[in-house]
A protein has these predicted regions:
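Short amphipathic, positively biased membrane-proximal segments
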Residues: 1-313
């Protein structure tokens, strides 16, 4: 069969990978099967506990708390960029380019470990469907690292063609890992700020929450401020604190969390926020919690979202 005769079959295969109006396509269907598969579930608990043996302050840094967003997407640029650049240089003639490609591969191998460590730290505080995809994502990237390490070794021994072949295989595998990472971030919303929509949906009108006398002292209750579900805490001093109820990390219900030292601790993954300003004093949350202004009129507690924090447009 001539190659031209195979083109329709190749095109049909490619089209089957893409989503259609009435079905997701093979790629998405495969990833969704990974989400639902329980085959690797016995590994999830031990791996999570191993990650949680790291000191909390170190985990906060690895999560990206100082940045205000996950650190993993930042660090993965180093190995991915290095390896992709090396692949381009491998296609160009010249001894200097071969040496530069080897140096880039070495840089990618050296920076893969910190990128992976931030990824594992984030992974340990996800939901099971996310953890399943994340585990395959990590395996793909680990395989790519092994291939690139082999590629570097072959190059150092003068076996350039073998080094290029291993590098190409590594680039293919790390691209699969990257695609799964994109699914994790954009389809499954891992690493996203789950309280970001509050600033867009909340209005700045005053809304009645409850009578002050009906609010228990030192215990969180759930209420509504317009379309936003909030947690309300009446302190012993009489001050009323109102925060968005859904945790910025993974949308856990803060109103069911523990109150201690002027903070609330999320019942799902332990993110801790100050009641007075919503600051995330401890991760895994990397973003603070939206806070509402409050006032008491004739014994009635009212709340509104601050005008300066409102986001629209």
């Amino acid at each position: 069969m001539a190659f031209s005769d195979k083109i329709p079959d190749v095109a049909a295969t490619f089209r089957s990978l893409l989503p259609e109006p009435d079905r997701p396509g093979r790629v998405l269907a495969t990833v969704e099967r990974i989400e639902a598969s329980q085959a690797a579930d016995p590994l999830l608990g031990p791996l999570r506990r191993a990650v949680h043996t790291l000191p909390p302050d170190l985990r906060d840094i690895l999560h990206g708390k100082p940045l205000g967003h996950p650190a993993h997407p930042v660090l993965v640029q180093l190995p991915m960029g290095s390896w992709t650049s090396a692949a381009v240089l491998d296609m160009l003639p010249g001894k200097g380019k071969r040496r530069a490609a080897g140096l880039l591969i070495a840089l990618g191998v050296a920076t893969a470990a910190p990128a992976a460590l931030t990824g594992w730290t984030d992974w340990a505080d996800l939901r099971k469907p996310q953890m399943r995809v994340g585990l395959v994502h990590a395996l793909a990237n680990s395989g790519a690292l092994a291939l690139y390490t082999t590629s570097l070794w072959k190059r150092l021994r003068g076996r350039r063609m073998a080094g290029r072949a291993y590098g190409l295989a590594g680039l293919t595998l790390v691209s699969v890992g990257g695609a799964l990472g994109g699914h994790l971030a954009y389809r499954q919303a891992s690493g996203a700020n789950h309280a970001e929509q509050v600033a867009a949906l909340a209005d700045t009108e005053w809304h009645a929450i409850a009578m002050l006398s009906d609010l228990p002292v030192g215990r969180a209750v759930r209420a509504e401020v317009g379309d936003i579900t909030v947690m309300v805490v009446r302190e012993a001093s009489g001050t009323v604190r109102v925060l968005a109820d859904r945790c910025s990390h993974m949308a856990g219900p803060l109103s069911e969390g523990e109150l201690e030292n002027g903070c609330v601790r999320c019942p799902w993954h332990g993110s801790t926020f100050r009641l007075d300003d919503g600051w995330n004093v401890q991760g895994p949350a990397t973003a603070p919690q939206p806070v509402f202004e409050t006032r008491v009129i004739d014994g009635r507690v009212e709340a509104r979202f601050p005008e300066h924090a409102r986001k629209n447009g």
